[in-house]
Every structure is written in structure tokens, then in C-alpha cells.
Amino acid sequence: MNMQNIRNIAIIAHVDHGKTTLVDKMLLAGNLFRENQQTGELMLDNNELERERGITILSKNVSINYKNTKINIIDTPGHSDFGGEVERVLNMADGCILLVDAFEGPMPQTRFVLQKALEIGLKPIVVVNKVDKPNCRPEEVYEMVFDLMCDLNATEDQLDFPVVYGSAKNNWMGEDWKTPTGDICYLLDQILEHIPAPEQLEGTPQMLITSLDYSNYTGRIAVGRVHRGTLKEGMNITICHRDGSKEKTKIKELHTFTGMGRQKIQEVSSGDICAIVGLEHFEIGDTICDFENPEPLPTISIDEPTMSMLFTINDSPFFGKEGKYCTSRHINDRLEKELEKNLALRVAFQEGYTDRWVVSGRGVLHLSVLIETMRREGYELQVGQPQVIFKEIDGVKCEPIEELTINVPEQFSSKTIDMVTRRKGEMVSMETQGDRVNIEFNIPSRGIIGLRTNVLTASQGEAIMAHRYKEYQPYKGEISRRSNGVMIALESGTAFAYAINNLQDRGKFFIEPQDAVYAGQIVGEHIHENDLVVNVTKSKQLTNMRASGSDEKARIVPATIFSLEEALEYIREDEYVEVTPKSMRMRKIILDHTERKRANRD
């Protein structure tokens, strides 16, 4: 394949602005699917979790052929918790498509990826999507994008970007948003015209490994873009590791991406993206070089983790009832496997234990996606409260600070500002957009844990919240966490409506009647600050004296159900979240009430 006929582009967009839909339509335009083949929606988000949350977690590669040119499309995760993924992926591209919603405009997370892309020097094409929505404002959004690029110090060449308007859902793109066209070829033509072809570099081969794939048959597969020279099947090569060591090995098979899949190929020349099968020991950031005189490429810098959690085996009374993998050996193997492909993750044993791990990552979302994935695979485990990773810089204790943007209706703005400042947030700017207010803060990562639930409650679910890591700054002082105590089950058994009904004035419950509970499990939130041990397993004594139906029937408020992130943000340091494939419970670490009292006294 001639180099002039390849384009490598990355797609940058905020969660839910239609990135994956756009790629679907590009695949259709490249006639990947036979006319009669049934295609699913969201072909790229092929991981169950991604479809449910509507977010892309892992980057995917697909390619289409258009006018004799191969376009490699690289889908990037939009969320800054997956920043480790984003940076490596951008290294494979020569240009990028910035996709923005015609109503919302560029969002904070988009800014994070765009900044990385402009720093590498990628040439952008801006696509204003969803112009079929009522009350959209494409012109204003275009201005906002331009201002954003200026803020991010884009070069003049980058600022001279083409704009495409359209609606990916309705399958059209054009240069004017008022006149729909019949297909998205206008966008593909812009890609061919404005995105530079990769440079053809002659010489000894070099390829930086930027992501991993795994196959049950062939093991780990290295994916990357050939930087220089050509790679051939069966060729002898040297792998230069990040730590400077070198290892001689051989390429078994080469694959390039075509459509949604891969095809086996004899050789790959510089500029194209390929997958190499048959290498044993390699990590992301290693370089594949010439056998005789290896010259490594500069490695990729990956953001350091900012948050850690304690993972431990499930030792609750309901241990092993629902999961397939419950032992420490299973969990350890699974975490080690995750380390191979999840770059921003770190795992270490807690000192003095072999069944407790400290797992560090980029944020609550990053770690909760891992827990959720493990849960679906049949693992049982318990997780402690998320802790922020402190650093000592020049003898000063420092903590990670994030940029937080909250968009709320005007009447809730003062409540929101009050909540954030109480958690040591500093307001940076505030602008009114119609009847909504956009407020920006700098806030410690500790302050964000548990903030989302509160802000959503205070704004009746209307707040839009986004945050991204900024830098380490000196420690900001104590932050008060959840102010209410919890209600703890007194003994194990089945919860009865009769008991719950009599306790409803003490707080709100997290369990329904007929749920199985165990002693020490958290069954609700107390109104006051102290914890309260309650007996929810007490049933009504029926005797001949009283007819069973004469009493008031129990009227029970529906239970509050937590998502995994909410539960992680809710618990205190003396509590765990127990995660099994079928259920999620919160519990005290010390289940026995007398022992817990004794521990609290010390």
C-alpha cells in the first residue's frame, strides 16, 4: 500500500456527543457491511459495560477504504479518568476530528483530550454534530471551539481548521447546517484533503507499542504504528524495554486492521497501524527495532495514579454464595492480568497481608469500572473507602487538585457553591448562559468523593458535573465527610416489613422487606450523627388473642438503591462495600458489635 493512501485519525468527543455513532456511519459509508448484513448500533462499544454507561473505556481501532485511501479511525475514551489510554492512542494519529454537540458545545473532558492532541501537533477537523436537535446553536458552538483552541495555545496552522456540520444519527454531513445532504461523504473528503498523510521514513524498522490486545489462542498482541522502515512476517527484531534492557525475538505474524477485524499480511510499511503476534515479554511504551542496531523511540509518559482503594477477599457471612471466584489467589491473578493492559493502574499487597491489595488508579470512575467488570466475570470481593494519594514535594505534604465544572440552573447556584466551598473548593469563574450557570472550581480530589450525589440531590438532578486532574498542591486541611450515622443490622436473618415499618422514623433504609441481612451489615442511614444498631429481623407475634389482619398494614418507603460509585463514595473508613455478581452490600469492617465498640473506644 502506498503511503500517500493512508490517513490516521483520532476522534475526540465528550461522553454522549455521538462519537461512536459517527464511527458507525463512517463504517457504513466505507461499505464495510454487505448490503444485507444486519448491523448493530454502537459497533465500537462492544464491551457490555460500555454500552450500559454510554462511555468508551478502551480505545478501538477500525479502518475504512474510501476513494482508494485507507482511513484508520482511532476511537479515544472521552473521560479524563482514562487519561492513560488517551495519550498513548493519540501517538498513533496524524490528525483528529473534534466532535461537539451543537447545543452543549465543548465540555471540560473534551478539553483534556484536545489539549493532549494539540501538544502532539495533530491537525484538527471540527464536526458540529446533532444540528437536528431543537434549540441548537451551531454558530455559537463554533465560536466556543475557536476560543477553546486559542486558550490551549494552538498554532496558526491548527487554528485554520475546516468545520463540518451534520447529524450522525440521520447520516448526513455538510458545510452548512441549514441544508442537510444525503450522506457523510463531505466529512470523508475533508479528511483526505486536510489531514496529512503519514511521513514515509526509510531506514531500519521502528515501532512504538501503544496498546495491547489479548487473544486466548496466541496470547498478548502488540499494537502500534510503524514509525520507520518496514516490518515483515518472520523477521528477527529487538525489543527495547522502557528500562533500557534489550531482548532479541522474532515476529510470528503481522496483522493490519480492516473494517472491524484484522487481516494477516506479509509486510507493513511505515505510517500504517498493525498488530504483531508472537512476542512474549513486552510492555506498552517499548520499541520494536532492528535486530542488528536497535534505536529505541522515546517512551510515552503516563499520568501517575491519584487515588487508591483497598481490595480484599469477601469474608462476610454470605461468602461464596453468589460468585464463582472468591479466593485470594483468584483475585490476585485477575488483578495481575488487568495490569497488563490497564496502564494507569498500580497494584501492591497491603503490608503484612497476602489477601489485601492496595489498588491505585486515576479516579473513582477508573477503579469502579474495574470492580464492575470483575463483578460481572463472577468475582466476589470487598472494597474499602477510596483514598487520595498524597505526595511529599520539597518537604510539604501535597494532594491532587482537580478542575471541576458544574452547570446548574440559576436558582440552585448558591447551594452548589456552598457545597463545593465547604469541601475546600475555590471558585475560579462563573458565567450565566440563559437560565443556567456554569461555575468552575479548583477542588482537592478528596472533596470530589461523594460530591456528585449531593449536588444532584440539591439541584433536583439537573446538574452536569465534570472534573479533571490538574496538579499537586499543598494539603488543604480536613474535609468533613458524610455527617449522618448509619443503621446496622443486629442479627442475621430475613428483614421483615413489620420491623422496618416501626423503624422508619429513625432514618431511611437501603434494604427491602424479605432481603437477607447479616449482623454488622449497613441497612440504612440514621437521622443523627451516631450509628444505631437496629433489629430488622423481628416479625410480628401472632396469637389467638389478636386477629392477624386487624392492625394497620405496614406502609414502607421504597429503599434507596446505590450504584457502585455512590456506594464507594458513601462509606467511611471503618466500612467496606461487598461486591458480588448478584448484589452489593455495605458493611462495617468489624461485624461483631461488642468488638466494634471496643475498637472505637481505643
Question: What is each stretch, according to the model?
Answer:
Residues 227-353, 376, 558:
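Catalytic P-loop NTP-binding/switch module of NTPases
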Residues 150-284, 288, 404-409, 442, ...:
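Conserved catalytic-core segments of large NTP-driven translation/proteostasis enzymes
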Residues 2, 32-59, 82, 148-161, ...:
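Active-site phosphate-binding and catalytic loops of NTP-dependent enzymes
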Residues 294, 302-437:
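Charged, conformationally dynamic linker/hinge segments
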Residues 17, 29, 33, 79-80, ...:
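Conserved nucleotide-binding/hydrolysis micro-motifs of P-loop NTPases
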Residues 96-158:
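Conserved C-terminal guanine-recognition region of P-loop GTPase G domains, centered on the G4
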Residues 257, 262-265, 398, 443, ...:
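Long insertion/accessory domains within large nucleic-acid-processing enzymes
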Residues 1-106, 144, 212-215:
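P-loop NTPase switch module centered on the Walker A-proximal segment
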